[in-house]
């Protein structure tokens, strides 16, 4: 199957695109876009892939499902477009960065600046019906994004994987911990951040690891 995605990713994921589950997933997603309000706009489904080539990835942040409110999600996990109110989880991420590294808290929730440096924030599920949280779960996206994680683990070295919350922590089984740094804690959601996300210092730990491997750190 021919999927419009950045070339370095296409070469590594073509095997997935040709599998029966992905063909079924594409048929489902096309049907959904045809009769429902689905997020993000179709051309933005692979935005984070198109913005961060495979060989440029340094830090992987795993999320679960897209924001379900129109105007929020554009293909980058936790991020929102310029001018959109910063969601609670992202506000807590910024708060932890401020406490960890002393960085000022941004007024914009757009994380494209991170992506340009090699941060790869990816949801496990890449589409959602508007106002219906998790409505596209168990349709095949999880199989695909698990394959992405495995590819990164197998073909790259010295990556940082940030796994926040019980769901993301399960993905540690897909990652070779002898080749990469795996950082886990609770989700930054306002419901859970105070139980371990605040004070986790994942952002300084990531930079310390990258520096120790001779890799340019992230300007969070």
Model-derived regions: residue spans:
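Short, conserved glycine- and acidic-residue-centered signature motifs
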Residues: 199
């Amino acid at each position: 199957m021919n999927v419009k995605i950045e070339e370095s990713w296409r070469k590594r994921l073509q095997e997935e695109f040709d599998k029966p589950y992905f063909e079924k997933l594409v048929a489902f997603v096309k049907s959904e876009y045809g009769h429902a309000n689905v997020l993000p706009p179709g051309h933005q489904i692979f935005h984070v892939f198109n913005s961060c080539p495979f060989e440029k990835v340094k830090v992987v942040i795993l999320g679960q499902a897209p924001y379900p409110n129109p105007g929020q999600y554009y293909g980058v996990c936790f991020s929102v477009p310029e001018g959109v109110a910063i969601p609670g989880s992202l506000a807590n991420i910024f708060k932890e960065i401020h406490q960890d590294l002393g960085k000022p808290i941004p007024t914009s929730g757009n994380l494209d600046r991170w992506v340009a440096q090699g941060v790869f924030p990816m949801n496990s599920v890449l589409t959602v019906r508007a106002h219906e949280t998790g409505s596209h779960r168990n349709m095949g996206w999880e199989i695909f994004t698990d394959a992405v994680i495995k590819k990164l683990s197998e073909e790259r070295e010295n990556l940082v994987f940030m796994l926040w919350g019980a769901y993301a922590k399960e993905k540690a089984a897909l990652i070779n911990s002898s080749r990469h740094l795996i950082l886990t804690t609770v989700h930054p959601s306002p419901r859970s951040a105070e139980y371990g996300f605040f004070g986790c210092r994942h952002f300084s730990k990531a930079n310390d690891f990258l520096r120790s491997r001779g890799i340019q750190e992230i300007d969070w």
